UniProtKB/Swiss-Prot annotation:
It is found in: Cytoplasm; Nucleus. The gene is parn. A divalent metal cation binds at residues 28, 30, 290, 380. It is an enzyme of class 3 (hydrolase). Belongs to the CAF1 family. GO terms for biological process: hemopoiesis; nuclear-transcribed mRNA poly(A) tail shortening; priRNA 3'-end processing; siRNA 3'-end processing. Its EC number is 3.1.13.4. This is Poly(A)-specific ribonuclease PARN. Its cofactor is a divalent metal cation. The keyword Ribosomal protein does not apply. The lineage of its organism: Eukaryota, Metazoa, Chordata, Craniata, Vertebrata. It catalyses: Exonucleolytic cleavage of poly(A) to 5'-AMP. The record marks 324 as: Interaction with poly(A).
Amino acid sequence: MEVTRQNFKEVLPEVCNAVQEADFISIDGEFTGISDGPSVSALTNGLDTPEERYTKLRKHSMNFLLFQFGVCTFRYDQNQSTYITKAFNFYIFPKPFSRTSPDIKFICQSSSIDFLASQGFDFNKVFRSGIPYLNQEEECQLREQYEERRGQMNGAGPVSYTPPSGTGVCNVPEDQREFIRSVEEKVEALLKNTDQTLDLEPCTGFQRKLIYQTLNSKYSKGLHVEALETEKKERFIQISKVDDEERRRREQQKQQREQEELNDAVGFSRVIRAISKSGKLVVGHNMLLDVMHTIHQFCGPLPEELDDFKEVAMTVFPRLLDTKLMASTQPFKEIIHNTSLAELHKQLRQKPFRPPTTECPEGLQSYDTSTEQLHEAGYDAFITGLCFISMANYLGSFLTPPKSHISARSKLLEPFYNKLFLMRVIDIPYLNMSGPDLQPKRDHVLYVTFPKEWKTSDLYQLFSAFGNIQVSWVDDTSAFVSLSQTEQVQIAMNTSRYAESYRIQTYAEYLQSRQKNTHSSRKWASDGWADTSYPSVAMTTASGYSHTDNWHQAVKRSISPSLDEQNHGADSSWTNYSVKKIKTEGSCTQTYADVAGSCDWPRLQADEGGASVSPVAEEAELDEFSANQSQGKRSRKHKKRKSDASETTPPALFDVPQVW
């Protein structure tokens, strides 16, 4: 169903009910662009740390506008073995609510706009009929404006001037006294004749304040004063003769109108709050940008630090699942060879997967997957949910006896919760939203700085004696170079000691230099370095999320051998994480390599001397696939000891702990 400003108020209750009834919710967003500076390859460097990737996206992607948001709710009908789906396609545009409301500025990227236009995107519908929104800070400011205005009407005094003490009459500036005198004369005439209302000429906001103050102090009873707007959007004062009861009634009506106006201004943010308040599983595809934009646009400014962002994100969306990451992990990675949304949907309609049966209630627009309305946010959210169901049900085939339906609340899905796919990062497959991120070994990586004129071929020439290498550009004058063997690092460092045109650092030295730069931008407190404080955002308990803390390349080359070939002695509690060769054609901007591997699924372990742990009561036994590997569920401390012990194993490109 298409939702615009014209039908949003009517559809909102249905959206909220669908969210409350859903087993899970899938989302998708369309943006006016991706990067305002770096190329996509520089924005998504293969050796970014999670902190670096977050900082880049926060700095270079948040000035674009999320202007179409898709929501699809899925509720499983046990009797019919069918999913009831309700898809909503929201057009969003930050139309200023009033002269004092935020006037949002955003940027567009021509390639993104051109692509959406080629897909039939209706830009007119966005700009003419887009649903407005306010984040929580903006909503609080608007409420304060209403309270201030109401206080001025009741004689509390305006901001720009102060009534003299004890007189009860406001202090009118000399240049406005003639204007106020003429208003008083017109009011006196109104009180003497039979007219019921008086419309004054349009005037400035300051003059309207003076009128409110003067009439409130001089005529405390018998008059109702209200600011209205002409067809030309000009504001004027209307004065009406009323008794006390009528005045109270009109004041109540005005407050109700203001509350409705405020709700209209909050707009689409109410949908996000409903989803957040529900606590339901939120599913997306390659959803890091979707989550960042959603929080930034509808909740509040993104914190500077990654850990603060994780805390905020987990407050807004307690459970997230990324289908791109799910498709890239065991047991799917050996079957699924292309994890783009369209291709993933096609592959999951074939054996060994089974597409789910869905049904759309009468009166709601349903999507036909045969028409492939890709890059319409509502449709993309719909097929993202279908992909999730197909993969979740496939996990049921590993149970004994096999189950054809796996609930969105099943513990079989817990390994995939709150892990968002990291695009093109070679050795860190996901961003762990609910815990510390993986820290791969990068002893074989060098950081090279060089003149701006250098090309990728120059770097390959420089390191030609070291065999296969991989180049990951950072910017125009620096890049990471991954060597095939760690032992070669010292040789490269010694060789470059007296070089004048370039400089080489180990990856550890590179990190140290970045930390020094970070310290230099921090303040010195009495107890040491202190981060610059991040402004807190007022959070209302009425919303679904309340956060009281601070709101926070270019020739064909292959990387090192897979971990299977390098780390035969790895501990059993660690996974076999394979790495596919990454090939590039032409310039680095044409590199499109997804890490096609992740943690083996499933691998359960039991407490020492205890029974094996079943995922859920109805899914009591794992089949032979997992039973042969199952040794019981260990405590977190025990897992940490295993993690530390693994460092004594032969060096690998990276080590990925299992997610169970």
